[in-house]
UniProtKB/Swiss-Prot annotation:
Cellular component terms per the entry's GO annotation: cytosol
Assigned protein family: Belongs to the PurH family.
Superkingdom field: Bacteria
EC number: 2.1.2.3, 3.5.4.10
Comment text on domains: The IMP cyclohydrolase activity resides in the N-terminal region.
Entry protein name: Bifunctional purine biosynthesis protein PurH
Residue ranges of domain MGS-like in the record: 2-149
GO terms under biological process: 'de novo' IMP biosynthetic process
Catalytic reaction list: (6R)-10-formyltetrahydrofolate + 5-amino-1-(5-phospho-beta-D-ribosyl)imidazole-4-carboxamide = 5-formamido-1-(5-phospho-D-ribosyl)imidazole-4-carboxamide + (6S)-5,6,7,8-tetrahydrofolate; IMP + H2O = 5-formamido-1-(5-phospho-D-ribosyl)imidazole-4-carboxamide
PANTHER family listed in its UniProt record: BIFUNCTIONAL PURINE BIOSYNTHESIS PROTEIN ATIC (PTHR11692:SF0), BIFUNCTIONAL PURINE BIOSYNTHESIS PROTEIN PURH (PTHR11692)
MF term (GO), any: IMP cyclohydrolase activity
Assigned keywords, A-Z: Hydrolase, Multifunctional enzyme, Purine biosynthesis, Transferase
Amino acid sequence: MTNLVPVGRALLSVSDKSGLLDLARALADLEVELISTGGTAAALRAAGLKVRDVAEVTGFPEMMDGRVKTLHPMVHGGLLALRDDDEHLVAMAAHGIEPIDLLVVNLYPFEAAVARGASYDDCIENIDIGGPAMIRAAAKNHRFVNVVTDTADYKALLDELRAHDGATRLSFRQKLALTAYARTAAYDTAVSTWMAGALKAEAPRRRSFAGTLAQTMRYGENPHQKAAFYTDGSARPGVATAKQWQGKELSYNNINDTDAAFELVAEFDPAEGPACVIVKHANPCGVARGATLAEAYARAFDCDRVSAFGGIIALNQPLDAATAEKITEIFTEVVIAPGADEEARAIFAAKKNLRLLTTEALPDPLAPGLAFKQVAGGFLVQDRDAGHVDALDLKVVTKRAPSDAELADLLFAWTVAKHVKSNAIVYVKDGATVGVGAGQMSRVDSTRIAARKSQDMAQALGLAQPLTQGSVVASDAFFPFADGLLAAAEAGATAIIQPGGSMRDDEVIAAADEAGLAMVFTGQRHFRH
């Protein structure tokens, strides 16, 4: 295949004009002829650069508000012609087609239009047609043509040209082509995803996902696995949009756990008071509210001090100095919060390995979105679990109704259970978790494990009775038998919240009545795998 190919003519047509003038001046210094369109040509001329309008090349004016300008054989012939094919060369000569050796294009800002909530018609107008067509043509003919679709590649292009006397190597053009095809694929994905949402298409015939490389990692979940982090361009506050103030680069597991922690803490409205979540291996090991953020952290920490070591902490309010002081008493991997004051950041600065992330906002837990999981031969797609219940949604199914205090704790426990791996059992007392059972194959085992861990914690704290005494319990799915409920009662629970829907609901309700428990059904399940 052809290796070194000189660049004598370039077509520049960009929406994002950052770095454009420096690139164009450098190309002009290398004696590259510049061709351009519309606003790009105007910007180049305003900078004193010599440029030909694409209309001069095609002999056809731009029309229909710029919808038709580069969709012409004089452009696509110049991009697609094989320079070592005699028939192609004859055709070029016969029709006066000039070769285009370099294409610099970035596309209409469709993703930005969607992100700002533009109207349907405005989004349609921001779908680029000519740009992707040229990009694909140039990328296909990368044996002879360079295609640049990212401003981040301008420097590499100029370095390549200067290193090879105005020419580029095949390996360089191949890398550019790969980037170009990935860009058009991502662009089409953005359009199809937006349109599926706009038209409320629940299961489009074809579904694709795209991302932009944000970080390559040392490894994935385990050292033998390669990994990278890609962002999807959405504005949802979280680890992908956060500012990292200090600490080592985030690992694969850090990102996964931090996301889990922040999505849970966002369920607790900061206007209703401070809340803290501590996560280990994507499961919460402590969640609490408090009169202050420091108190919320301390109460969450007391749920499971052993598991909290080396964990991830998420806060629903900006980090303050008092909370920062408490957090630094043990080893913590990551702290994420909407903000952090200067004094808190100064305290953390002494802990060089502690990663601090701020997001300026919390994600909306009720916002629609998609979740997907890869399986062999395909992937599963579903709505994000934005399910929510309040007191009016609950059905009291036992003789005794929960007290106001129990009801508040039941709703708190239900919120936490939504974010615990199934089978999930969560004990809560006075707005704080006191036991979490996660990921067990049987519900009764999760119930017993959570109670046992709570008893161990009570002993470590020097308490006279288990933390679960007088608590309430949430179960992410129904109790198939009464055994799990009875285990919770034995641990000291006084009220239960669960979806209901078991064939043995009557048996479970009867057991609750006999034990003097209050129980409510939500009618909604929160499996999490």
